[in-house]
A protein has these predicted regions:
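Loop-helix junctions at membrane interfaces
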Residues: 1-166
Length: 166
């Protein structure tokens, strides 16, 4: 294995663990489940690792958190949704990285918005269609919007700080 591949695998495992821990440690219970800081780590995984490594790190870490927290019925949806959050953020960031320009805070936040729209709609669809909760799944939308906003702000702050490290 090349050193770069080993580095990516180690970082992916670290981000999976960070996604899991950030989801489980800071849990704010709500009627629709819980709000957590895992969203920040999912976005950051995509931005740092790129689309596919980020997809698997975010999906596995977040899915593991759901499993360990007793929400096993959410694991398949969480794996896909959180993986897509990282994948979309990474794909939208890629063209800006190729230009080599400094990316301002607001632009990073805008890049992450589509990922969070997928998260909010993804969980609504999963709860409504797969788990059979119908329109009552809409009750989780405000909670997910708050989680998305917190995730965007924190991940942009962390990414900006990390991008200054050589």
């Amino acid at each position: 294995m090349k050193n770069e591949t080993i580095r990516k695998l180690v970082l992916s495992a670290m981000f999976a663990a960070l996604c899991c821990v950030a989801t489980m440690i800071v849990q704010i219970p709500t009627v629709a489940g819980y709000t957590n800081l895992g969203e920040c780590m999912c976005l950051l995984a995509g931005l740092v690792l790129g689309p596919w490594y980020g997809f698997f790190a975010a999906g596995i870490g977040s899915g593991l958190a759901d499993l360990l927290a007793g929400y096993a019925h959410y694991v398949p949806g969480t794996f896909l949704i959180k993986g897509l959050v990282a994948l979309i953020a990474a794909l939208l960031l890629r063209p800006l990285l190729k230009k080599g320009e400094k990316i301002p805070f607001w632009r990073l936040a805008v890049i992450e918005l589509p990922s969070e729209v997928v998260m909010v709609l993804g969980y609504f669809g999963y709860k409504a269609l797969i788990l059979g909760k119908g329109l009552s799944a809409a009750a989780s939308i405000p909670n997910n919007l708050v989680q998305a906003a917190i995730g965007i702000v924190l991940s942009v702050l962390l990414y900006t700080a990390l991008s200054k490290v050589p």
